[in-house]
Amino acid sequence: MIEKILKDIKDLFKVQDKAKFLKQNIPYLAFFYVGNIFSHHIRAYTGGDVIDKIFQGILELNTMSFIPSIHLTDILIGIGVAALIKFIVYSKGKNAKKFRQGKEYGSARWGTRKDIEPYMDEKFQNNILLTQTERLTMNGRPDNPKYARNKNVLVIGGSGSGKTRFYVKPNLMQMHSSYCVTDPKGTIVLECGKMLEDNGYEIKILNTINFKKSMKYNPFAYIRSEKDILKLVQTIIANTKGEGEKAGEDFWVKAEKLYYTALIGYIWYEAPREEKNFATLLDMIDASEVREDDETYMNPIDRLFEALEKKEPTHFAVKQYKKYKLAAGKTAKSILISCGARLAPFDIRELRELMSEDELELDTLGDRKTALFVIISDTDDTFNFVVSIMYSQLFNLLCDKADDVYGGRLPVHVRCLLDEFANIGLIPKFEKLIATIRSREISASIILQAQSQLKAIYKDNADTIVGNCDSTLFLGGKEKTTLKELSETLGKETIDLYNTSETRSNQKSFGLNYQKTGKELMSQDEITVMDGGKCIFQLRGVRPFLSDKFDITKHKNYKLLEDYDKKNLFDIESYMKRKGKAKLNRETVITRVQ
């Protein structure tokens, strides 16, 4: 008991913040003053014990002097009185029962304009548009650091909920950043491309539906080091799994990795610039003949690596190839068959041409305002591995350039609006990338039909990805997992409940009982039947908002869209012809004929 009291006294006078300590103890100076002058008053009496003096002093308060005494006894008694009062107040507060009036079962509520105001930029254009009334500033370093939030957004909405109309298009109309937009069916570039071009944006298009309406993309053009080779191989493996193949990295997959790494390493180091592409990789695989009955047989690729080993025994590609060659003839043949099956899409001549050279210049998106539209099919995922490779390289290239060239931050923010994110495929290490891109002025908007889509692709890492999105926008849907998690994160509010009772007998009696109970701010069934014009927006550290979806017709740039005027339709073929002529003019060398 004594130890507990001593501990309380020690905690009572524990000083952590001097300014706060002084502020909290100023009121107790009044008790010090009362104790000091009363001590001086009763000390003036002689005779009798202390109790008699105290009673006598109380009876003659009108004669008490109000001038503080500097006598040591009076000072000590004043301090003692103040300390006693403080200890009583502290003990009462520590042992007091905690009542939260009106919040007994939960304190959830909908956010108001006052809640979101600190997170919005005064200049409308410098915001991410989320709802009709809620926005998020693009400034990653606000004056008050506690209002800093990353710009990663998780957008969830079932088919027809307006993910493109209510989120993608409004944010493209802001035109404050460079954009990389996944464009299912290729309609967004047609409707928004002219607006962006007229406002100084350079348009880039990667089209995996119609290769003839696409700019060329060559992953080999972005290999800077051996680690980039490993990343490229990993992305190919992760997104080109055949039907029925084991999910784990079994022997065959590891062997394929070795072979791809060896060949790509050779191409990157030794091949001329015009041959650094997938066509060369396919040609090398086709030339890798293996004879089961003749282990000494050397195919053309064996001879290439033999010559390279003589020139440079410790070459990166040679090391990988020697590991691959440890396989016996029959095993090596099986590996080659697996490689051929995995890269079968490259047998299409148009795809080879698409990836023969590079026109996208991915590493320049953070240098100047650029809009890259990635057109993918929403029904066929055959060529989605190309998109996955592109995004993997894009994130790594921009992060490296921010660190190596710009001191950690790109001059132009790059926003990746990843519509139909589940159809892109697996981006290796995306859970780590999304956690680190913020500081480089890069952000990702992950747009899904249901949250379960993310878990299907990224498994245990899905929660990490969601956790790195400070903003969540729900546009509507009925997938159970999404509804359950959303309802739980909204929390519970405390409501009043009353019960009525009726007793039937000779004399009727009625009863009315009032009590409080907890209720979800919005239950799963209420979310399911939510008005089609409403959406739910959640920002980390702020109450959720039930608001109207953004009305794009009210945006000042709406008149620049094809939605407003069919004359604003973006002509992809015409644009690419103009870009082709401009490129030809830049690269043409004129020589004088004597």
Predicted regions and their residues:
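P-loop NTPase motor domains
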Residues: 2-4, 18-21, 25, 29, ...
